Amino acid sequence: MWNTFIAIENDRFGFKTVLHCVIGIILFIIANITAAIVSKALSNIISVNSIIIILNCCFSILFFLLLILLYIRKGLRKQLDFFRINNIKPSKLFILISIILPCCVIGFYYFFINGTLSVNNIKMHEKLCFAISIGLSAGVCEEILFRGYIMKLVEIRWNRKIAAFVPSAVFALLHISGGMSIIDILQLLLAGIAVGVMFSSVTYASDTVNNSIVVHGVWNFFILGITGISVKSDSTALLAYAIRSDNIWITGGNFGIESGLPATIGYGIVILLAVLVKYKREK
């Protein structure tokens, strides 16, 4: 029975593929909940909040890696390389892109969109720890799950084009929150699929999730941790830039600038670069 279930290469209707993908997402949720519980327990002993933030990040990564790697090796009986989870070093090009992309988006808003810049200098060490943790945890866990595990499963059952799109759509859907209008959701789906395809393209470019881990992690570090750009002043980031604009293509709607047009254009440019790198590598 189990041998039939894990025979992912022989999945006529795709049911097994979907179930394995759902299992991966469940393991991700379990890891995060467990990390939060452990961190909460430790907060009764450790009073320094910045340490708790870093510990929660480390636990999230550790628990998820243990669960997903255990399931891949013992459950699916596959090697990690099969899912592009390997020790290939991140490309210097994509390391550079990971820095240029968020800096260009931040620069666009600062130089071309009117707003008010402020420094959240209260508990700066906590904000820096938050920036590091949100970059590391999302970069490592989400990329191994979506661009490593799920993308390969979908690729086996269907093809690479669908594999690049489907995890990206799921990735976008998981970011939908309450209070969003239809326009907000559509805009989030457009940008979410674009950023997901970008991470997928970056992974395919050198056949490793390590590139997308770097691009995703550095993006979160700068956009969500260091510089909070939104209509209202962001107190969680180190720097806050409150923009004065009602244009949803600039503000990104309720989700924020990650679903705005400037960021989406950036995703598109990186996708083209990744495709070119892939083409040159295979030529």
Tell where the protein language model's regions lie, with residue ranges.
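Membrane-interface helix/loop boundary segments of multi-pass membrane proteins
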Residues: C141-V166, V170, S201-N211
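Juxtamembrane helix-loop-helix connectors linking adjacent transmembrane helices
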Residues: W2-F5, S39-I54, G75-I144, M151-K152, ...
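Hydrophobic core of alpha-helical transmembrane segments in multi-pass integral membrane proteins
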Residues: G24-I33, S60-L70, S98-Y109, A263-K278
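Short, Lys/Arg-rich, polar N-terminal cytosolic tail immediately upstream
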Residues: M1-G14
